[in-house]
């Protein structure tokens, strides 16, 4: 019997099994759209970044002016730059919603998929930070100085590590060159990890809103979810383009439109909005090493979720108390983002410390609350 080429060709069949004939649960909701949206965001960032790299100069004397040149002189360069900068914000917004969906529906029980996802999150945050340094404005320079200086908290090796990353005794030309190099290569590593992430996901199959085994109720990915994803792409691009044209510099720091000056410190040093929750947690710990550990743990704690899982049913949709706790956690993370942008003074310091305790307590209380609810059902 004749088989279509998509099933017989050694290369096309791989794409076919991942995008066309892939068996998918029939009831997955719009929350499952964010995976494909993240792939779209990554493609957008790689393409815009590639064209920006053609005109960018990774040198402290010319970096700021080269960004200025891209926006003023390069044909549609302003659009590329704003697409790349705001695309990063939208990338992180989708990333946080993707992780939030994984926590809510307990998709972390697919251990390998979850672990690669957390590694991707770490790498994406590193890439975002490196990109923030490249325009070489005031916030770029001081952000790079402050964040890289955190490594000096590592016992014995601290200062050696910092100087190794700087390539000297201060943030200088060498630092900018290597940051640009890593910022360029990391998205391709993320792309490779994304393939591994999908490979692990397709071995187990997707989770679904009911948290049940859906092997008896699978439908082909194409056309059902291809069209659903395309609709998601259209909505995403519409929001992004509207945002770019109306609020193009809203998410950027005004300080970064001033060339870097090592002799003048900005009043308030802060990273981009998508790091502010972690930055607030870092500042909440009075000890430097403790702050760095808390900063890493704010993301790494996601890795313990598969091991603390204690509920009989899969997903918080069956646990009303856990739902309240989850949405409380969303509010806490949002407030931490706000606190991270505030100056280090009362009442913000105390508020940040309370929110940090609430953030980490979620991961302790959640499994206990699920166990309590299961006990009530018995």
Curated annotation (Swiss-Prot):
Q: Which InterPro entries does the UniProt record give?
A: Cyt_b/b6_C, Cyt_b/b6_C_sf, Cyt_b/b6_N, Cytb/b6-like_sf, Cytochrome_b, Cytochrome_b_C_euk/bac, Cytochrome_b_N_euk/bac, Di-haem_cyt_TM
Q: Which top-level group of life is the source organism from?
A: Eukaryota
Q: What molecular function terms (GO) are annotated for this protein?
A: metal ion binding; ubiquinol-cytochrome-c reductase activity
Which residues does a ubiquinone bind?
202
Subunit structure, interactors included: The main subunits of complex b-c1 are: cytochrome b, cytochrome c1 and the Rieske protein.
Q: Which co-factor is required?
A: heme b
- Short name of one Pfam family for this protein? Cytochrome_B
The cofactor note from the UniProt entry for this protein is:
Binds 2 heme b groups non-covalently.
Output this protein's name: Cytochrome b
Principal localization? mitochondrion
Q: Which GO terms describe its cellular component?
A: mitochondrial inner membrane; respiratory chain complex III
Q: Which UniProt keywords apply?
A: Electron transport, Heme, Iron, Membrane, Metal-binding, Mitochondrion, Mitochondrion inner membrane, Respiratory chain, Transmembrane, Transmembrane helix, Transport, Ubiquinone
List of residues binding heme b b562? 84, 183
Q: Name the protein family.
A: Belongs to the cytochrome b family.
This chain's function reads: Component of the ubiquinol-cytochrome c reductase complex (complex III or cytochrome b-c1 complex) that is part of the mitochondrial respiratory chain. The b-c1 complex mediates electron transfer from ubiquinol to cytochrome c. Contributes to the generation of a proton gradient across the mitochondrial membrane that is then used for ATP synthesis.
Its record classes its membrane topology as:
Multi-pass membrane protein
Please give the coiled-coil regions recorded for this protein.
Answer: none
**Protein's cellular compartments:** Mitochondrion inner membrane
Biological process according to GO: mitochondrial electron transport, ubiquinol to cytochrome c
Record-listed heme b b566 binding positions: 98, 197
Q: What other note does the entry give for this protein?
A: Heme 1 (or BL or b562) is low-potential and absorbs at about 562 nm, and heme 2 (or BH or b566) is high-potential and absorbs at about 566 nm.
Tell me where the transmembrane regions lie: 34-54, 78-99, 114-134, 179-199, 227-247, 289-309, 321-341, 348-368
Species source reads Anopheles quadrimaculatus
């Amino acid at each position: 019997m004749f088989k279509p080429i998509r099933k017989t060709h050694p290369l096309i069949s791989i794409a076919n099994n991942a995008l066309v004939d892939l068996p998918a649960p029939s009831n997955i909701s719009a929350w499952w759209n964010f995976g494909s949206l993240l792939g779209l965001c990554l493609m957008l960032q790689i393409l815009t970044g590639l064209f920006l790299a053609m005109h960018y100069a990774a040198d402290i004397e010319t970096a700021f002016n080269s960004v200025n040149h891209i926006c003023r002189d390069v044909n549609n360069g302003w659009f590329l730059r704003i697409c790349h900068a705001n695309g990063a914000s939208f990338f992180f917004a989708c990333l946080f919603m993707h992780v939030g969906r994984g926590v809510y529906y307990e998709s972390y029980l697919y251990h390998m998929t979850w672990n690669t996802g957390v590694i991707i999150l770490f790498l994406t945050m590193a890439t975002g930070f490196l990109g923030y340094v490249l325009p070489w404005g005031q916030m770029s320079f001081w952000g790079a100085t402050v964040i890289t200086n955190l490594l000096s908290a590592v016992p014995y090796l601290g200062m050696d590590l910092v100087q190794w990353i700087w390539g000297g005794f201060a943030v200088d030309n060498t630092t900018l060159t290597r940051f640009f190099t890593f910022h360029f290569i990391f998205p391709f590593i993320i792309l490779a990890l994304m393939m591994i992430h999908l490979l692990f996901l397709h071995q187990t199959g997707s989770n679904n809103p009911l948290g049940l085994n859906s092997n008896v109720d699978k439908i082909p990915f194409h056309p059902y979810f291809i069209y659903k994803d395309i609709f998601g792409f259209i909505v995403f691009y519409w929001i992004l383009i509207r945002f770019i044209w109306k609020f193009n510099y809203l998410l950027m720091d005004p300080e970064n439109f001033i060339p870097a000056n090592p002799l003048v410190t900005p009043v308030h040093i802060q990273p981009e909005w998508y790091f502010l929750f972690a930055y607030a947690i870092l500042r909440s710990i009075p000890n430097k090493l403790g702050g760095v550990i808390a900063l890493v743990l704010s993301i790494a704690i996601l890795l313990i979720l598969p091991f603390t899982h204690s509920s009989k049913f899969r997903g918080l949709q069956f646990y009303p108390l856990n739902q309240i706790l989850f949405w409380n956690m969303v509010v806490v993370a949002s407030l931490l983002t706000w606190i991270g942008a505030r100056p280090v003074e009362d009442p913000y310091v105390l508020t940040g410390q309370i929110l940090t305790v609430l953030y980490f307590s979620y991961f302790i209380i959640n499994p206990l609350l699920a166990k309590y609810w299961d006990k009530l059902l018995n």
